[in-house]
Amino acid sequence: MTHFLKQTVESISESIRFDSSLSSPAADMPFGKGAADCLKHFLDRAAALGFETHNYDNYVGEVIFGNGEPFAVLAHLDVVPAGSGWTRDPFGGEIEDGRIWGRGAMDDKGPAFCALYAMKALKDEGFVPARTIKLIVGCNEENGWACIDHYKKVATMPEDGFSPDGGFPVIYAEKGILHVRLHFPVKNAPFTFFEGGESHNMVCDRCEATPRTLAVTRARAMGFEIRNKKIVSHGKSAHASTPEQGVNAIEPMLRYFEDKSEDIKRVLDCVFRDKYGLKTLRDETGGLTLSPDLIKYRRGELQVVCDIRYPATLPLSAVTEKLSEMGVKYETLRHQEPLMQDKDGTLVKELLAAYEAYTGEKAQPLAIGGGTYARALRCGVAFGPEMEGDEPVIHHADEYITLERVELLLNIYADALKRLTK
């Protein structure tokens, strides 16, 4: 597999140079030019490797290998916004220090290309799959899955498969995902402007406000940047499913104004201090997490968009009952049911075997708070690329994937595909 490493690394680096975060739609480009160009690049590479490819209206593409009952590998090429705090060009695709740097390196352009070149390795060694491997690459995973909805309208989604967009050894369960917008009225607001966050599923790393009366000493003591009459708090971005890995810039900004308004204290109590016990909900898949990722002051109220990941065995009503106890208006922006697969099923067992073959580790399947395309399948799981002990880089500044991990993914994915489609 080593002879494909150089090509894989180069392709990942090239792909990172496309800013494929969601942007304004253009003609025949539903998620913007960057996403469409990135999809074209991926499919062009696949075609050059000798595979049949399809581009479904720049929503989603697929690469075909083999004949028979379809088996899915579901990856995505879109990314979250770069955010702040980078020490390298987030869209440079720089290869240095044994790593490929840039937004999407780990989530999910790197793994997508590893799956593609794993298929190429199997093809070149003469392996003929007894099933049709469909490598499906979407362009709207981070913002609503319109790509998958479109695919299901124009093509046939396989029943089973895996998504290289989670973690190892195998992810058998994913928490439910609920995005809500909470509306907090603020009487006599002590600010004229308050805004923070870039994405609903990314911990806010920058928040700005314009106080009616600027307390310079207090602002400096809290570590805020002062720009004319505006104050700026800085945090650290992270994936909203693991908010503890980041530092939310919204919280200190709210605390700055807390002593001036009971309404501000209420916001803190609801979304940061867990006064109503949302985070007490838990099961075998873990506890509920709540990440307030976006905030805006509009028409006399603070609107806060929260990303909630709730335990996989609990009903949605367990969460909405707690939200109702807050006594504030809220609206549901997005909901995805949890995923639970059989730990002892063939899919999980074969993937664990492939993982063990290249790591030497006998491991058990895990549950996560992240949401992957595996939910689009009747029998789907997430399989890599993250491993226990990895530095958190997904949705963080200075995202990267190591060349060592790229090589490992090439081997594991090739082995897994052979086991599941022979």
Model-derived features: where do they sit?
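Conserved active-site and cofactor/substrate-binding residues in soluble primary-metabolism enzymes
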Residues: H3, K33, D37, G110-F113, ...
